[in-house]
Every structure is written in C-alpha cells, then in structure tokens.
C-alpha cells in the first residue's frame, strides 16, 4: 500500500513540474560560438586595451617633472592631535618628502 502511495505521489509531482531546458541560457547561441566570441574579444578588445595602457605608461614616464605647489599652512589641514605610532610621530606611514608636506612645510626647502 505504501509503495502505491509513493508511486502515485511521484507521478503527480512529475506531471505538475514541466521539464524546461536551461531557462537562463541563450538558446540562439550555442557553445561552439562562445569560444569564438571570447577569442575575438581577446584579440580585438583586451590586447589593444593592454597596448594602449602600456603606451600611456610609457608616455607618462617621459613627460618630465611637475612643479609642486606652494605650501600654504591652512589651519584645517595636517592637524596632529597625537603623534603617529611610528618614526618620529610627525610623518605619515607612506610619507614622501618631495610630495607630502609636514604641518610646517616641505622638508627639503
């Protein structure tokens, strides 16, 4: 009796659920076109993008030096209420003396 009940329930569940093929896949494009698409994107989008980025880095490296701006001691910038826990306490962690001023001005002036 229990076997009959299980088989009838499984038949009912099987009929109520239609068998759909992959609903999220694009049926018009097959898997054979997918490899061709990615190969095309690699050669015509990714590699030229890398080449343009390399050219940009090369041109920026030969651009030359920039003049740094004049130091103006604004009261709301570079506030030190307590020292940094490294070094002398006045330099930030990634301090660059040519670019980053201290509260009193640039170091190499």
Swiss-Prot record:
Extract the transit peptide range from the record.
1-24
Q: List the disulfide bonds.
A: none
- Tell me which parts of the chain lie in the Mitochondrial intermembrane compartment: 60-109
Output a single Gene Ontology CC term carried by this record: respiratory chain complex IV
Q: Which terms does the record give in the GO molecular function aspect?
A: enzyme regulator activity; oxidoreductase activity
Any idea which UniProt keywords this protein has?
Charcot-Marie-Tooth disease, Membrane, Mitochondrion, Mitochondrion inner membrane, Neurodegeneration, Neuropathy, Oxidoreductase, Transit peptide, Transmembrane, Transmembrane helix
The pathway to which it is assigned is: Energy metabolism; oxidative phosphorylation
Q: Which SUPFAM superfamilies match?
A: Mitochondrial cytochrome c oxidase subunit VIa (SSF81411)
Which CDD domains does UniProt cross-reference here?
Cyt_c_Oxidase_VIa
Query: In which compartments does the protein localize?
Result: Mitochondrion inner membrane
Task: Identify the residue ranges that face the Mitochondrial matrix compartment according to the record.
Answer: 25-34
Q: Which PROSITE patterns match?
A: COX6A
Similarity remark: Belongs to the cytochrome c oxidase subunit 6A family.
Q: Which disease is it linked to?
A: Charcot-Marie-Tooth disease, recessive intermediate D: A form of Charcot-Marie-Tooth disease, a disorder of the peripheral nervous system, characterized by progressive weakness and atrophy, initially of the peroneal muscles and later of the distal muscles of the arms. Recessive intermediate forms of Charcot-Marie-Tooth disease are characterized by clinical and pathologic features intermediate between demyelinating and axonal peripheral neuropathies, and motor median nerve conduction velocities ranging from 25 to 45 m/sec.
How is the quaternary structure described?
Component of the cytochrome c oxidase (complex IV, CIV), a multisubunit enzyme composed of 14 subunits. The complex is composed of a catalytic core of 3 subunits MT-CO1, MT-CO2 and MT-CO3, encoded in the mitochondrial DNA, and 11 supernumerary subunits COX4I1 (or COX4I2), COX5A, COX5B, COX6A1 (or COX6A2), COX6B1 (or COX6B2), COX6C, COX7A2 (or COX7A1), COX7B, COX7C, COX8A and NDUFA4, which are encoded in the nuclear genome.
State the name under which the record lists this protein: Cytochrome c oxidase subunit 6A1, mitochondrial
What is the species listed in this Swiss-Prot or TrEMBL entry? Homo sapiens (Human)
């Amino acid at each position: 009796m229990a076997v009959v009940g299980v088989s009838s329930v499984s038949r009912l569940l099987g009929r109520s659920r239609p068998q759909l093929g992959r609903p999220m896949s694009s049926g018009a494009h097959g898997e054979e076109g997918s490899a061709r698409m990615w190969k095309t994107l690699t050669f015509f989008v990714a590699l030229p993008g890398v080449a343009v980025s390399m050219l940009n880095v090369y041109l920026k490296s030969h651009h030359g030096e920039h003049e740094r701006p004049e130091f103006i001691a604004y009261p709301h910038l570079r506030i030190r209420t307590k020292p940094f826990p490294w070094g002398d306490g006045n330099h930030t962690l990634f301090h660059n003396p040519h670019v980053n001023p201290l509260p009193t001005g640039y170091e190499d002036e």
